[in-house]
Amino acid sequence: MTEVQSITTSGEIKMPLSPSSSSSSISSSTTNNTNIKSIPILSQCYSFSGKGNGKELQDKIFRQNSRHSNGGWKFVDDIELKKQRGVCWSLVKSVGNSIIEGKELTSTCLPIELFEARSFLEKVTDTMAFGPLYLKAAAETNDPIERMKMVASFVVSGLHLTTTIAKPFNPLLGETFECDLADGSSAFCEQISHHPPISSWKLLEKDGKYKYTGHFIWSAGCRGNVVKGCLKGPHNIEFADGTNIAFTYPDVLIKGIFWGDRVTEFCGKMLFTDEKNDLACELIFNPNALGFVKSFFSKQKTPCDTIDGRIFRINNNKIKDGNCDKINPDDVLCKMEGTWLTSFLIDQVEYWNIRMIPHGVIYRDPETTLPTDSGRRDDIKHLKMGNLEEAKKYKALIEDNQRKQKKEKDEKLKKDEKLKKEDKKNQK
């Protein structure tokens, strides 16, 4: 494995910020081979130049986190963690134990101290940070298998960038966010539903080589000391030759909400399908995970950020609801391994590693964006400026207005339903 990690004196695994910033290294748990070859395009991402926010975003992630000795991002900002936990305990006292017994958090009014100064719509674009590298390469190849490899690498490459400790603001119905990517692609996000919260997006390559569309139906619930987040919904990358690769996202676990190490992990499976070329790709996150009881008596064999996967012919392999229970070994075309915090290998060739610097997105001039843009929200603007009390005030005003609009909408629906029933009765 190439040198992508260094060990701290406490035994934790620390991520370097550049290819040369690590003086000591360890080999990944997935392989002991020190002669791993990388695909050529990776060399484009070992230095940063351009207008994108990728380096700033990644530097923030590296400042806040280090890789836990058992895998996963461990949050290391003790001051921020102490502040957040104080707010969380206050929340439990004010709303009762329902908050730690599985109550849906997306419909819960949370204190502003738990938020970062941006909307979830902007956070969605963090997953697109490596788009100019991988999606361009995917669009330019004529090999369907290589294209599937690039799309899978694109998704894996962005996972470590999504694990910020602070919560983004819930978007308002009709809220938008727009930005550009380094290759000239443009992204547009919109909140299309409030209950349930649904965020949609469209990423368009400037010459029509690819189009990435989809939406997240997002939910989160707390169980004791753990929050589980789910991002359901379709993701489709359509290429100029008519190929469409559809895929799903894994769930996320945030452990240590109230006590212990604050660690973020991904769990479950991702399934990519290319029906035109009879191809599929399955990625399993934390494949050797132990159950709750077993974890008390046994030590897990591999880090929890481990990924195991394969690309295979769909043929007669049954795919249902985003899952493929059993894959015929004869249909497997290549194997994948690695972790979402070190490197990602496909048939022992490196397709991504943590030393790579993402392009990120380029923000547009606020004067050119729509009036509904996230950046125009008063609560977000004041939080960015550090005006906590003003941010609280505007957040409360926005939430009161949302409740009022919902009440008016519900009353109108009831009234319309009543009129329909009366019309039917009169017709008889």
UniProtKB/Swiss-Prot annotation:
The gene is osbI. Residues 389-422 form a coiled coil. SUPFAM superfamilies: Oxysterol-binding protein-like (SSF144000). Residues 1-11 have a biased composition (Polar residues). Disulfide bonds: none annotated. InterPro entries: OSBP_sf, Oxysterol-bd. It holds the Pfam family Oxysterol_BP. Keywords: Coiled coil. One of its GO terms (cellular component) is cytosol. This is Oxysterol-binding protein 9. Residues 18-32 have a biased composition (Low complexity). One of its GO terms (molecular function) is sterol binding.
